[in-house]
Amino acid sequence: MDIDPYKEFGASVELFSFLASDFFPSVRDLLDTASALYRDALESPEHCTPNHTALRQAILCWGELMTLASWVGNNLEDPAARDLVVNYVNTNMGLKIRQLLWFHISCLTFGRETVLEYLVSFGVWIRTPPAYRPPNAPILSTLPETTVVRRRGRSPRRRTPSPRRRRSQSPRRRRSQSPASQC
């Protein structure tokens, strides 16, 4: 079965393929962040959001994986085989867990739409040849102000007039109006 853990959140595994494995913080740092920011909601018996539930599940999966890794470490006598298992878990499973934790913590911190925009913006940025892209990659925490990929609709901020258009210092002349048109 090919299950995409991001599908119900509007993302996909492919969106993460543009982010290097060293982009994601360590599992320990992510767990510390989740605990510091969302401990009450994660430990609450009440349902908060789908992101909280998914984050809870990812944390539980990591705990089970660490239990298995400890068992393997204690019971597998061949050091080469033990190293292979530990390396596989850290490289493959560790990356998947780090991606999941990062995604759900980021959604809770910045909002799902912002995180999705970031993933799309970064994917566009990284695929654009260096000669044609801005020098700096999109940054998640500043994305709403700097993103190139915008949602349809009006921009929430007002645009200021172009600095090239200077207004005259003299008062503006008004056309004379007929008395009938003044209300």
From Swiss-Prot:
Residues modified as Phosphoserine: S155, S162, S170
Compositional bias ranges of the Basic residues kind: 149-176
Pfam families (alphabetical): Hepatitis_core
Repeat (Sequence) residue spans along the chain: 155-161, 162-169, 170-177
Keyword Transferase: no
Post-translational modification (record): Phosphorylated by host SRPK1, SRPK2, and maybe protein kinase C or GAPDH. Phosphorylation is critical for pregenomic RNA packaging. Protein kinase C phosphorylation is stimulated by HBx protein and may play a role in transport of the viral genome to the nucleus at the late step during the viral replication cycle.
Region (Disordered): 136-183
Annotated segments matching region RNA binding: 177-183
UniProt cross-references to InterPro entries, sorted A to Z: Hepatitis_core, Viral_capsid_core_dom_sf_HBV
Main location: virion
Name of protein: Capsid protein
Species of the source: Hepatitis B virus genotype F2 subtype adw4q (isolate Senegal/9203)
Lineage: Viruses, Riboviria, Pararnavirae, Artverviricota, Revtraviricetes
